[in-house]
Every structure is written in structure tokens, then in C-alpha cells.
A protein has these predicted regions:
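Extreme N-terminal starter segment of soluble prokaryotic enzymes
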Residues: 6-11
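A structural signal for short, well-ordered beta-strand segments and their strand-loop junctions
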Residues: 14, 47-48, 135-141, 220-224, ...
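Short, structured active-site-proximal loop/turn typified by the sulfatase FGly-forming signature C/S-X-P-X-R
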Residues: 24-78, 137
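Short secondary-structure boundary/capping segments
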Residues: 26-30, 152-157, 236-241, 283-294, ...
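Metal-dependent active-site segment of extracytoplasmic phospho-/sulfohydrolases and closely related
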Residues: 34, 246-289, 442-444, 502
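Short, solvent-exposed loop/turn segments at the edges of secondary structure
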Residues: 56-58, 265, 282-286, 314-317, ...
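His/Asp/Glu-rich, glycine-adjacent segments
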Residues: 67-234, 384-419, 438, 452, ...
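Active-site neighborhoods of enzymes that stabilize oxyanions during catalysis
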Residues: 118-122, 306-487, 493-495, 499
Length: 509
């Protein structure tokens, strides 16, 4: 039931891979006047913690569902589907998409991610607001599941690509009241030209959002600005002032449509957030190739998956490794762990073990046994932990821990575990390992390394993200006209706080 309805509508603006220091640099250089005006009027959390792995599908699901991967079930850019015995690839690169089949990737990315992979037992923001009778809207964004049915409307390059392969994408979907998803879904006619080309999508998103503002067509809008991610991948995060400036220009179109900054803020509250940050990448890590020296690794288009011993899912600067229950000789978990521990570039090895210290593995989707203990290994340093009462974290959760805190560069002060290098480390690793589709091993790579995707691509010479490291994980969270009066109301903010803040604004918490 709706509580006291707010006087302001709310726009949740997401800027992919936005780093707080680069945002501030753009403002200081006069390249982002719109964002500067919003920063002057709002409450900034400079170090909001992303998901782990800190990649867009996982982070966006966390943002919109208010839960970690154990709750929303999306585990990476690439993951192994234990039930279907295949990889799920969301488009790490065009080359990776070709390796798995472009149509298969498109189907998983657009349709299955929302209507099959995302936990059906968890409600998205759109679903909760739709049920409450609020008008919802979304420009192109990975997680859009809502209560309104939308017919597919192929257009432009995507139509020609689908027609050329003679594969028909004719599926309706369920989303917010107003849904724009490039060439695929458009809930109304707008004078906006969609683009399926990475790095050229902000303009279409801003055009659609401005039309919705002009028509007073929503109470809640998720407005996405994804192009900064592509620019940072190609040129490195230190060069992202250019793409931030373009995102600022696109946001200014909404301000203009509303009649200027004062008129805009009189009618709209704003939350601006990054899904993750980026760090510089210098080397690719061919994880599957290295493990193939000792085991049979499942390939993208494997005709006999039952013969494979391992599945390897690169996901930026993180990776999942799965032990497969094939028909042949199974890989020994301890041998796999030892092999991973000597690979240069693997910084953290995260896994579960039982009370006897034996590895816990899963052959089917589902959470591990209730007595499982998480382990983080970093070279010879080893830390075991599970929920308990021994020590707290900055989010208020409590843990039992045993081992070397140097594994995550952590200290305990006044009964609270802190790590500047790996923010919110215990909860993020625990959530990743408890994801039903998570690997038996979840890896976080060392600075400068990125896992080579199944298309043979890395962003060496540019930037990437995915690791547990602070450089990948910390981004801005800005509240204007809603949310806390001061950032210190929480000692540590994460993406899991975004959905509750939206619901609170509409009196639904």
C-alpha cells in the first residue's frame, strides 16, 4: 500500500563505469556543468560499493532488486548454466558473441536475463512500483522486468542482422509502463534514433527520456547513460572526462525539457549512481587456455559437454571456474585450487569448504550446504569466514572468522572489520559464492590483469572492472531532493541501498 505520496517524481540515473575522481575532474575543468549543478544541490556518497564480480549485469541486478547475487541470481558477464549444461554469455565482446552465436547471446541478454535468469521470486523496482499504481519508465537498461507487456518491434541494423540470419526474434517481454530498448522495444513513438553500436547509445536514451519529461509520462524513470563504459574500456579510465562530458550534455536535455535546472528540481528528485568503476588493464589472462593444460575445459559450442571437466567463465577482472560432473574422470578440486594459486594475475581465490576442510562443489543450481564456510586465499594467506557473532562489518552484518586478515588487507577496529583495498569484502564474496549460478571457484584478478573472454578479447591498453578491488568497485552515489540529509547516515553505502531509497521516496518502506 502506498504511504504518503511524494510531491516529486524520481529519476534514477545510471552512468556506466563512472569514477568519482573522474567526475570531479570533469566538473573542475568545466566539462560537466549539469553534473556540477546537481552536485552543488545534493548529497554525494563518493565511495558507494559495487557488487562482486563488479560487472554490469550483476551490479544492475543488485541496484534494481536491492539484493546481492544470492538473491537475484545473475552472476557475471559469462556464467555456466548447470541445469542446461551450457555457458550463458551476455556480450563480453562482439568476438565472444560470435563464438557463442549472436542470436543466442541476444536472446540471453535481452529476454532470458530478465524472464529466466533473474530470480522470479524477487521483485524489481519496476514490479513493486507497478503494483503500487505508479507510472514507471526505463530507457535502455539491462534489468527492466516489470508488470507491463511489450511487443517486440525490430528496427534498423538489428532487423537486418536478424533477417540476414533468418532467425526470428518475436518474443514479447514484461517491463515498466514505458520501455525503450534500442531496436527491440519501444512503448511509444518518439523522434529518437536507436543505436545498437556500443559507445553511441547515450543520445538515444536522452532523447527518449526528454520526450517522457515533456509528456509528464512517469512517476519513476530509470535513465541510463552507458557510453562512458565503452569509452573507458577503449581509452582507459583516466581519459573518461571526455565521455563524462558527453553524458553531462545528454543529461542537460532532460533539464532543458523540464524548463531549466530550477524547474527540473522543483518537479523531480534525482539519484545518480555508477554501477562500478574501472581500473587500467595492461595484460590479458588466458585462464581457460592455462587450465586446458591439465583438464578438459568446456568450449563455447561444445557438442559433447558431458566430456568436459571444467567450465571457465571470464567476467572482466574476475572469473568463475566450475567443476563439472561429466561422464569421464572428474577434476580434483584440490588440484584445481593448486593450479589456480600459481597462475600469475590471480590475486584472490574464493570458494567454499565444509567443516572438515574439504571443498564444497555443486553439480546442480542451488545454494551450498548450510554448514559451508567461505575461504579467501591470497598466495599463502588464507581467511575462513561465515555468518556469526564474532566480528562486525561496516554494514552491520556479523561474522565468524579464522585465519589471516592480510588475505584481504583488513584490520579489526572496535570490533569492526575494515579493508580499504577490498571494500565490504566478506559480504560481497559470500553473496557471490552463494549465487545459485556462481562458480565453485570465484577469482578476483590482480591490478592490471583482465581475463581473456571466449572471443580472445581483452581491454589491455584501456580499462576494465570486475575484481573485488576498490579501484573496480567504488563509484559515486548522489541524492538530490531525496535520500539522506548527510552521507554519514551510513558508514558504508552499497548498490543494495539504491532500491530501498527509491521505495522509501514513494512511501513503500
Amino acid at each position: 500500500m502506498i504511504g504518503a505520496m511524494p510531491t516529486k517524481k524520481l529519476i534514477l540515473t545510471y552512468v556506466d563505469s563512472l569514477r568519482t575522481d573522474m567526475l570531479q575532474r570533469a566538473v573542475d575543468e568545466g566539462r560537466a556543468p549539469t553534473f556540477a549543478a546537481l552536485l552543488d544541490r545534493g548529497v554525494l556518497v563518493p565511495d558507494c560499493v559495487s557488487s562482486f564480480p563488479s560487472v554490469t549485469p550483476v551490479a544492475c541486478a543488485e541496484m534494481v532488486c536491492g539484493k546481492g547475487a544470492d538473491g537475484h541470481w545473475v552472476s557475471g558477464m559469462n556464467w555456466y548454466h548447470r541445469l542446461e549444461r551450457r555457458y550463458v554469455e551476455y556480450g563480453s565482446s562482439m568476438e565472444a558473441s560470435r563464438a557463442f552465436g549472436v542470436f543466442r547471446v541476444l536472446y540471453d541478454l535481452v529476454y532470458n536475463m530478465n524472464l529466466a535468469h533473474l530470480n522470479p521470486g524477487v521483485s524489481t523496482l519496476f514490479e513493486q512500483l507497478d503494483v503500487a499504481g505508479l507510472r514507471t519508465a526505463c530507457t535502455p537498461f539491462l534489468i527492466y522486468r516489470g508488470r507491463h507487456r511489450h511487443q517486440v518491434s525490430l528496427d534498423g541494423l538489428l532487423r537486418r542482422a536478424v533477417d540476414a540470419t533468418r532467425l526470428k526474434f518475436r518474443h514479447h517481454t514484461w517491463g515498466p509502463g514505458e520501455l525503450f530498448y534500442g531496436d527491440l522495444y519501444a512503448s511509444r513513438e518518439v523522434p529518437c534514433k536507436p543505436s545498437s553500436i556500443p559507445g553511441s547509445r547515450d543520445g538515444y536514451s536522452a532523447c527518449c527520456a526528454a520526450e517522457l519529461v515533456k509528456d509528464d509520462a512517469f512517476d519513476f524513470l530509470l535513465f541510463s547513460l552507458p557510453d562512458n563504459d565503452n569509452y573507458s574500456h577503449r581509452h582507459g579510465p583516466e581519459a573518461s572526462v571526455e565521455s563524462i562530458s558527453k553524458a553531462d550534455h545528454c543529461f542537460a536535455k532532460l533539464i532543458e525539457a523540464a524548463g531549466g535546472i530550477d524547474a527540473f528540481l522543483a518537479d523531480y528528485a534525482l539519484i545518480l549512481v555508477a554501477d562500478h568503476a574501472q581500473t587500467s588493464v595492461h595484460r590479458g589472462l588466458p585462464l581457460a587456455e592455462l587450465l586446458e593444460r591439465n583438464w578438459s575445459v568446456l568450449q563455447p559450442s561444445e557438442s559433447q559437454p558431458e566430456r568436459a571437466q571444467l567450465a571457465v567463465s571470464p567476467t572482466g577482472r574476475a572469473a568463475h571456474v566450475y567443476l563439472l560432473p561429466g561422464e569421464g574422470e572428474r577434476a580434483d578440486p584440490e588440484a584445481v585450487r593448486e593450479a589456480l594459486s600459481v597462475i600469475e594475475g590471480v590475486e584472490l581465490i574464493c570458494r567454499f569448504e565444509d567443516n572438515s576442510g574439504h571443498p564444497v562443489t555443486r553439480s546442480e543450481p542451488g545454494t551450498p550446504p548450510s554448514d559451508a564456510t567461505a575461504v579467501i586465499e591470497r598466495g599463502p594467506r588464507r581467511l575462513r569466514f561465515r555468518p556469526g557473532d564474532e566480528v562486525g562489518d561496516l554494514r552491520g552484518r556479523r561474522w565468524e572468522i579464522d585465519g589471516d586478515l592480510d588475505a584481504i588487507e583488513a584490520t579489526i577496529e572496535d570490533g569492526l572489520l575494515r579493508s580499504e583495498t577490498f571494500p565490504d569484502p566478506l559480504a560481497r564474496v559470500w553473496l557471490a559464492l552463494n549465487c545459485p549460478h556462481g562458480g565453485d571457484f570465484v577469482l578476483s584478478l590482480a591490478e592490471g590483469y583482465e581475463a581473456v573472454d571466449w572471443g580472445g578479447v581483452t581491454h589491455a591498453g584501456g580499462g576494465s572492472h570486475g575484481a573485488l578491488h576498490a579501484g573496480d568497485s567504488l563509484g559515486p552515489l548522489l541524492f538530490v531532493g531525496c535520500g539522506p540529509k548527510d552521507a554519514s547516515e551510513r558508514e558504508q553505502w552499497t548498490l543494495r541501498d539504491v532500491a530501498p531509497a527509491v521505495l522509501e521516496h514513494f512511501g513503500l518502506r
